[in-house]
UniProtKB/Swiss-Prot annotation:
InterPro entries: ExoRNase_PH_dom1 (IPR001247), ExoRNase_PH_dom2 (IPR015847), ExoRNase_PH_dom2_sf (IPR036345), PNPase/RNase_PH_dom_sf (IPR027408), Ribosomal_Su5_D2-typ_SF (IPR020568), RNase_PH (IPR050080), RNase_PH_bac-type (IPR002381), RNase_PH_CS (IPR018336). This is Ribonuclease PH. Phosphate binds at R90, G128, T129, R130. Belongs to the RNase PH family. Homohexameric ring arranged as a trimer of dimers. It catalyses: tRNA(n+1) + phosphate = tRNA(n) + a ribonucleoside 5'-diphosphate. It comes from Cutibacterium acnes (strain DSM 16379 / KPA171202) (Propionibacterium acnes). It is an enzyme of class 2 (transferase). The gene is rph. GO terms for molecular function: 3'-5'-RNA exonuclease activity; tRNA binding; tRNA nucleotidyltransferase activity. It comes from the Bacteria. Phosphorolytic 3'-5' exoribonuclease that plays an important role in tRNA 3'-end maturation. Removes nucleotide residues following the 3'-CCA terminus of tRNAs; can also add nucleotides to the ends of RNA molecules by using nucleoside diphosphates as substrates, but this may not be physiologically important. Probably plays a role in initiation of 16S rRNA degradation (leading to ribosome degradation) during starvation.
Length: 244
């Protein structure tokens, strides 16, 4: 595989086209439609006064997330989990990942006893749905915090940084950035990397689907991810009209 022989002709270190559109739903305190290529996720932030029972009286806020895919987001229809009566393991895992990633850049005390829930609904899936969800949900979170600030509902500034996420992997022995589904399904190594805007790692999820990877290859993948996250940070900044 050459540097120009990826499925869509991208370079090995090149993201798919990234689009971040704010204000997608008028009812939500924050609403963002984010696209990584053909992968499209609607991220809505909802603010409620109060916190879960186990957190009441602490003076701390709570940020959490729920992730789900529309039945026909993929090539074949998948049944609605609500009809099955339980949330699937993958859905639960990704919901927790999105929530953890956002909480990494939130000062719970400054948020006060308010809850912000991020709903990430995948409209179309072509690889990287969890990383697109994190990247888009952060922008929706910022809009929700700004809404709360405008209502006088904040103790102080709760956002202490930015967060981005991207996938990397090894396909046919070659490391590459931002895998589309057809690449991801053939990957020897698949990794999702969440980073803060200052370049620190929030979470790394990596698996050798085939051949194990060594430390040098891991470093190469992390370097690819760092470059991708820096580009995503710029896209978030442009969408918000501020410098993150």
């Amino acid at each position: 595989m050459s540097e120009t022989s990826r499925i869509d002709g991208r370079r090995l270190d090149q993201l798919r086209d990234v689009r971040i559109e704010r204000g997608w739903l008028s009812q939500a305190e924050g609403s963002v439609l984010v696209s990584f290529g053909r992968t499209t996720v609607l991220c809505n932030a909802s603010v409620t006064e109060g916190v879960p029972r186990w957190r009441k009286g602490s003076g701390l806020g709570w940020v959490t997330a729920e992730y789900e895919m529309l039945p026909r987001a993929t090539n074949e229809r998948s049944g609605r989990e609500s009809r099955k009566g339980k949330v699937g393991g993958r859905t639960h895992e990704i919901s927790r990942l999105v929530g953890r990633s956002l909480r990494a850049v939130v000062d719970d005390k400054a948020l006060g006893e308010n809850t912000i829930i991020l709903d990430c609904d995948v409209l179309q899936a072509d690889g990287g749905t969890r990383t697109a969800s994190i990247t888009g949900a952060y922008v929706a979170l910022i809009d929700a915090v700004n809404w709360l600030r405008g209502r006088g509902g904040l103790v102080s500034e709760p956002i202490i940084g930015s967060v981005q996420a991207i996938s990397v992997g090894v396909v046919d022995g070659i490391p590459m950035l931002d895998l589309a589904y057809k690449e991801d399904s053939r990957a020897d190594t698949d990794m999702n990397v969440v980073m803060s805007g200052n370049g620190d790692f929030v979470e790394i999820q990596g698996t050798a689907e085939g051949t194990p990877f060594n430390r040098n290859l891991l470093n190469e993948l992390l370097d690819l991810a760092a470059g991708g996250c820096a580009t995503l940070k710029q896209a978030q900044s442009e969408a918000l009209g501020v410098t993150l």
